Design a protein with these regions (language model features):
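Conserved catalytic or regulatory cores that recognize and/or transform ribose-phosphate-containing ligands
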Residues: 1-109
Length: 109
């Protein structure tokens, strides 16, 4: 079974874009697809966005996200991912690892 990692922009978005990650996770789940994401726990349950910038330490968040990414077989890129340095890094890692890539606004690569 293929597990997807959801990647997308977070910084400079309200609530760190968690609502978009939650929506994408729900769509994948409804399609019978297993997924991991920085806005979900390891069981796929939505996490609450950090309340303050002090709660959102991006380096730690990136470390946790990369740990999830390497457990997956494919990556699903949310709209706007090209503007995010972290999502760009996740994308490049996924390509290097030979993961299937899908794009929220385009389909599969």
């Amino acid at each position: 079974m293929t597990t997807f990692y959801i990647s997308g922009p977070m910084d400079e978005y309200p609530q760190h874009n968690y609502p978009a990650f939650h929506k994408a996770g729900e769509e994948l789940k409804n399609s019978g697809i297993t997924f991991l994401s920085p806005a979900h726990d390891m069981s796929g349950n939505p996490l609450q966005p950090p309340n303050t910038e002090e709660e959102y330490l991006w380096q730690e968040h990136l470390r946790q996200s990369l740990q999830k990414l390497v457990l997956c077989d494919a990556i699903h890129m949310l709209k706007g991912w090209q503007t995010s340095p972290n999502a760009g890094l996740e994308y490049r890692i996924a390509l290097t690892l030979g993961m299937t890539t899908t794009f929220q606004d385009q389909g599969q690569e």
